[in-house]
Every structure is written in C-alpha cells, then in structure tokens.
Amino acid sequence: LMIQIYNPENTDFEKNGNMTLFPSSATVNAKISGAWEVTLEHPLDDEGRWKYIVDNAVVKMSSFNGEQLFRITHKEKSESEITADLQPIFMDSKDDCFLMDVRPTNKNGQQALDIMTAPNKKYSAKSNIADINTAYYEKMNLIEALNSDNENSFLKIWGGEIVYDNFTVVIDKKAGSDRGVEILYGKNVAENGMSEEV
C-alpha cells in the first residue's frame, strides 16, 4: 500500500510521486453525492517525508474504488504530526472546467455529461441513466452544473448518485451506500491495511 505524494506542479500521475508517505492514518469518507471527507495524518518523521505535505499537493492512495488522487486543501502541524484535509481531484474542475452556455437538449445521462465535460478534455463522465431530459447551464463551473442548488443541476434534472473516480465522475441511477475506508499503517495492521465501513 504505497501512498505517493506529488508536488503541486507535478501532474504526471502515471509515474511515482515526488515522495512516498508513511501516514499513521488515512481516511476516505465518501458520502454518495455529498462531500468526500479525506484526512491524512503523518508523523513528523526524521526523513522529512512530512515536508512534502503542502497545500495543493496531490496524494495517490487506495480507496474503496481503487487508486485515487486527492488534492490537499488544508494542513495543520502539531508538535508530533501533520494533519491534512484532501478532496477528490475531480474537484479541480471547479477552477478549470467552465460551462459558458451549454444546453444538453433531449439527452440521456451519458449524452448530457459528455456535453458538460467537453469544455476540458481532462474530465470525463459515465452514466447509466436512460431518462431523456433538457437542461441549461450558463456561466457555471462543472461542479455547480453537476450538483448544486441550481434547478438545472444534473442531479436535479436527471437524478442519480455521484462517485468520483480520479478525472472521471460516475453518475448512475444507484451508486450504492455511503462508503468509508480507513487505511491504517503500522505493525499491527492486516496484510492490506484496509478496514472498510459501509
């Protein structure tokens, strides 16, 4: 269970990160269609691995849906450890995928999402929703268009449940229950080091 960290300017996530982390704990709490709470705690180790835990760095670690990328949004240091809050990397689309005037018209879920993610080829989407609907997105980012209070948001019009999978968002009729994964490190941990609560 390698946890890799990538410096903020490093976007080559296919390769190993700038450093391997050995956190004391890493938790992914995935609320279906809600906020994902991701927390990482790391000792202030002599090798200085902890110094790589900076705002906007990206951490690659195992989650309930395979290896996932999370971006650090906040960090706090105490005398003995550093704690970081992270979010799925798909949330980057708040800042780099804008829908200026996008109108999926008489489209099913997949067709609508293909149109909505088109402004930035970095992102993609998958959906099994067959319902045909129309929506209108003007001057909003992709996250707002997918899941916000806006009456045109994808979830309000097509329904479904959101799961983030790196640069892909999966919105299916039923995604399952809220998932939580705690990844623990140290000597007294099972082989794969993962405990999963559903």
Language model features with spans:
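Juxtamembrane "anchor/assembly" segments of surface/extracellular structural proteins
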Residues: 1-52, 87-93
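Hydrophobic beta-strand residues in large extracellular and virion-surface proteins
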Residues: 3-5, 38-40, 59, 72, ...
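Short, acidic/charged, Gly/Pro-enriched secondary-structure junctions
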Residues: 3-11, 45-78, 103-118, 152
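Leucine-centric amphipathic alpha-helical interface motifs
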Residues: 5, 197-198
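Short, solvent-exposed secondary-structure boundary motifs
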Residues: 12-21, 58-67, 146-156, 190
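A structural signal for short, hydrophobic beta-strand segments that form beta-sheets
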Residues: 23, 72-74, 189, 195
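Short, ordered beta-strand-loop transition motifs
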Residues: 27-36, 74-82, 163-167
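Charged- and aromatic-enriched interaction segments used to assemble
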Residues: 80-197
